[in-house]
Design a protein with these regions (language model features):
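Linker/hinge segments immediately adjacent to helix-turn-helix/homeobox DNA-binding domains
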Residues: 116-125, 129-134, 138, 144, ...
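Short helix-capping/turn signature of helix-turn-helix
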Residues: 4, 250-253, 299
Length: 301
């Protein structure tokens, strides 16, 4: 998909345009697998740019449950697992990935390297770095056998980050250099950006290049964005949509303005706000409730 290729190069606006074209082409024609692939990109893009997926992950899952298709749910599980792993939210990763039960799922051979790469990202989010290192040789052999160069690039980057966190700096630098060499011809920056926090000490030791400069630029921007969007523990009971509404309320947007921003009805926003206050056990008049909500939002995660 062209949108995916543009995203991997860090061209977020162009990727967003192509993503919307892809959604427009498949809308209403039953190509659910393609729609789920688009969703996977949309959620990763939302971590890097002002892109709001049409449905929250929870809403998407509810829609898929009504269609009783296990393979579609497995794709959703993979998307949610990777997204929450990138956000550093291991507690929100779906059970299938959080408990590493992929072996219980029938995955067709062409999809297996990608699924295993997702699981690697989950292991990293859980701090299981030795697992990532231990799996890497087998995963890279699988990727080579199937000519999955992009997945192999992700695995090398993940393994470099794991080695670095384990204090194995020599091994980490060797893998990073190979990954940089693999990514440079096509300007593939996102595998590095998505693992930027674990690569910062390694990148600082490398001779600067256009590729490294771009990785650092996007990685730092991603860090700042993640810090702005971090969810305080006091708000952990909220769904993605509810937390999104809380952030917009903190910007002093009215219910009508929030509805316009999220393509909801004003009535739906009012219902969400009511649910938010109920879940957080916030009482009082409107001004008091908003002030208390802002206090919770500003609390340390």
């Amino acid at each position: 998909m062209r949108a995916e290729a543009l995203f991997c190069r860090g061209r977020f606006t162009d990727a967003h345009i192509e993503l919307e074209r892809a959604y427009a082409q498949i809308r209403g024609n039953g190509q659910e697998n393609m729609a789920l692939c688009c969703d996977f990109l949309a959620w990763r893009l939302s971590l890097c740019a002002e892109v709001e997926p049409e449905l929250t992950l929870e809403e998407r899952r509810e829609a898929l449950l009504r269609q009783h298709n296990a393979s579609w749910l497995n794709i959703w599980n993979a998307t949610a697992a990777y997204y929450h792993a990138l956000r550093g939210e291991p507690e929100r990763i779906p059970e299938l990935f959080a408990q590493h039960r992929l072996s219980a799922v029938n995955i067709l051979a062409p999809g297996k390297p990608m699924m295993e790469m997702f699981e690697n990202q989950v292991y990293l989010a859980q701090g299981a770095c030795a697992k990532v290192v231990g799996r890497s040789e087998g995963l890279l052999a699988m990727c080579e056998g199937m000519h999955y160069a992009l997945v192999a690039l992700h695995v090398r980057v993940q393994t470099a980050a794991a080695y670095e966190r384990l204090g194995k700096h020599t091994e980490a630098r060797a893998l990073l250099r190979q990954a940089l060499s693999d990514g440079e011809p096509d300007g593939l920056v996102m595998p590095f950006v998505e693992n930027y926090d674990g690569l910062v000490p390694l990148l600082a030791q490398e001779i600067r290049s256009d590729l490294i400069d771009r990785i650092v630029e996007l990685g730092e921007a991603s860090r700042q964005r993640k810090m702005r969007n971090v969810r305080p523990r006091a708000l952990s009971a909220l769904t993605e949509r509810e937390f999104e509404i809380v952030r917009l309320m903190a910007q002093r947007l009215s219910n009508r303005e929030i509805a316009e921003r999220l393509f909801l009805t004003e009535g739906s926003v009012k219902q969400y706000v009511k649910q938010i206050y109920s879940k957080l056990h916030i009482d009082g008049d409107t001004r008091t409730k908003r002030r208390r909500l802002n206090e919770l939002l500003e609390a340390k995660a």
